[in-house]
Curated annotation (Swiss-Prot):
Catalysed reactions listed for this entry: (6R)-10-formyltetrahydrofolate + 5-amino-1-(5-phospho-beta-D-ribosyl)imidazole-4-carboxamide = 5-formamido-1-(5-phospho-D-ribosyl)imidazole-4-carboxamide + (6S)-5,6,7,8-tetrahydrofolate; IMP + H2O = 5-formamido-1-(5-phospho-D-ribosyl)imidazole-4-carboxamide
Protein name: Bifunctional purine biosynthesis protein PurH
GO biological process: 'de novo' IMP biosynthetic process
A Pfam family hit: MGS
Coiled-coil positions: none
Pathway it works in: Purine metabolism; IMP biosynthesis via de novo pathway; 5-formamido-1-(5-phospho-D-ribosyl)imidazole-4-carboxamide from 5-amino-1-(5-phospho-D-ribosyl)imidazole-4-carboxamide (10-formyl THF route): step 1/1; Purine metabolism; IMP biosynthesis via de novo pathway; IMP from 5-formamido-1-(5-phospho-D-ribosyl)imidazole-4-carboxamide: step 1/1
Molecular function per GO: IMP cyclohydrolase activity; phosphoribosylaminoimidazolecarboxamide formyltransferase activity
Annotated Gene Ontology cellular component terms: cytosol
Source species: Burkholderia ambifaria (strain MC40-6)
Length: 521
């Protein structure tokens, strides 16, 4: 039964109402500093910890709760007579409920004007110590670190005569250990990122020790293949527009491959300003287009490769309306992603309950890092978010691209970044015409892309081509020109650039170098 609570919080959201409810239930309130003042100003009966322990706060508040009368009351096991006798001997009442959240270290170091001294002063000592004590003794002590749990605790207390069951205490304790681990991880990341220990501003993006925190969203039926087990975790720092923040409106449970492919589709479609549609199969775009609206964009994207689109993942950067829904519903689709779905669109898919509909806010945020596991290690890099500016483009051929060709080239370049290397993408009129992905030879990717267009009945005459990396020889260029391309965009940087540029002039096409490579493995 909860008779006495200690409350000390930095985030004071809802704390007055929570404390009032506890007081109304007959719970004695202990508190510190600013929290105690807030509760007292609200008219609540509260005892300062300094008065409770008989020992004043000291060292500018660095020592408040580090006292046997606090930690003894938290850590004592109620089922051990010797523990209870020790409390009685030293006149230490039990503390049955601990409500603590920590100094805002992460928010502090995010400020541009933060100094190392500021960061150090926002490393909480007493808070984590109390939290860990209470979480360790969770059989007897309820510990709350998240304001979202205030209502849960109150409801259970009211239903059980001020008592909290073991299941709730255990869940709250695990939440505490996760929270303190994340807190210490953030401190470690910060301190080991300093390249000059006297300068907050001098920080490496890659700390000497890297700690990351993820919460499990769900267990998955299996992994990439049925014999592999799997689960999906959400980055606690995920931006609003990230796939992990999806809301599933209907459909079967997402699979490992559904999630991986959905991320590829969503990241690609977000890069377009005009209404766009991206169709993904095995993490590669098999159709991308912009149009007047979602239905128009889908119709154009589907034309690229109707065969591969079967059972694909489809993403839109605009609301899916009834017209778009009716067009998509004619095909077999695994997952459909959009910022929103109209009521009429939802009604269309209500008859296809296996189709997974995901809503995600169309935010600008991206993951801070791109991660790849290797044997015994982790590769960490900044996200490939580079968008070339017109001023960075260099026309290296005698012929300049026309305005239409320039639009097609920039569209193709945007798509190529999301195609597995080696990537060759034919485009025209705001849509992909042929995609060659994942080949060991760039010339093979070029051949496959042209074959794909031929199989789809699409002409490549007058098309634009993007290559994610340079042409090592002229052979790849010869293939795309033979297929009908009249302009090419590529990074350049090959030791044979002059030979490739000369071949472009020989063919009478326009070529642009970006100076940016987009390998994707």
């Amino acid at each position: 039964m909860i008779k006495q609570a200690l409350i000390s919080v930095s985030d004071k959201t809802g704390i007055v109402d929570f404390a009032k409810s506890l007081s109304d239930l007959g719970v004695k309130l202990l508190s510190t500093g600013g929290t105690a003042k807030l509760l007292a100003d609200a008219g609540l009966p509260v005892t300062e910890v300094a008065d409770y322990t008989g020992f004043p706060e000291m060292l500018d508040g660095r020592v408040k709760t580090l006292h046997p009368k606090v930690h003894g009351g938290i850590l004592a096991r109620r089922d051990l007579p010797e523990h209870m006798q020790a409390l009685e001997q030293h006149d230490i009442p039990t503390i049955d409920l601990l409500v603590v959240n920590l100094y805002p270290f992460v928010a502090t170091i995010a400020k541009d004007d933060c100094t190392l001294a500021d960061a150090i002063e926002n490393i909480d000592i007493g808070g984590p110590t109390m939290l860990r004590s209470a979480a360790k003794n969770h059989r007897d002590v309820t510990v709350v670190v998240d304001p979202a749990d205030y209502a849960v605790v109150l409801d259970e207390m009211k239903a059980n005569g001020n008592a909290i069951g073991y299941a709730t205490n255990f869940r709250l304790a695990t939440k505490v250990f996760a929270h303190t681990a994340q807190y210490d991880g953030a401190i470690t990341n910060y301190l080991t990122s300093l390249t000059d220990e006297l300068q907050h501003a001098s920080r490496s993006a890659y700390p000497a020790t890297l700690n990351m925190a993820f919460d499990k969203v769900q267990d998955l039926r299996y992994g990439e293949n049925p014999h592999q087990s799997a689960a999906f975790y959400r980055d606690l720092a995920a931006p609003a527009g990230a796939l992990a923040n999806y809301r599933q409106l209907q459909g079967k449970e997402l699979s490992y491959n559904n999630i991986a492919d959905s991320d590829a589709a969503w990241e690609c479609v977000k890069t377009f300003d005009a209404p766009a549609c991206v169709i993904i199969k095995h993490a590669n775009p098999c159709g991308v287009a912009v149009g007047n609206d979602s239905a128009d964009a889908y119709a154009k994207a589907f034309q690229t490769d109707p065969t591969s689109a079967f059972g694909g993942i489809i993403a839109f950067n605009r609301e899916v309306d009834e017209a778009a829904a009716q067009a998509v519903a004619k095909q077999f689709v695994e997952v459909l992603i959009a910022p929103s779905f109209s009521d009429a669109a939802k009604q269309v898919f209500a008859a296809k309950q296996n189709v997974r509909l995901l809503e995600i806010a169309l935010g600008d945020g991206h993951n801070a890092f791109d991660l790849k596991r290797v044997g015994g290690g982790l590769l960490v890099q900044s996200l490939d978010s580079k968008n070339v500016q017109p001023s960075e483009l260099r026309v290296v051929t005698k012929r300049q691209p026309s305005a239409k060709e320039m639009d097609d080239l920039l569209f193709a370049w945007r798509v190529a970044k999301y195609v597995k290397s080696n990537a060759i993408v034919f485009c025209g009129n705001g849509m992909t015409l042929g995609v060659g992905a994942g080949q060991m030879s760039r010339v093979d990717s070029a051949r496959i892309a042209s074959i794909k267009a031929q199989n789809a009945g699409l002409t490549l005459a007058g098309s634009a081509v993007a290559s994610d990396a340079f042409f090592p020889f002229r052979d790849g260029l010869d293939v795309v020109v033979a297929a009908g391309a009249t302009c090419v965009i590529q990074p350049g940087g090959s030791m044979r650039d002059d030979e490739v540029i000369a071949a472009a002039d020989e063919h009478g096409i326009a070529m642009i170098l970006t100076g940016v490579r987009h390998f994707r493995h």
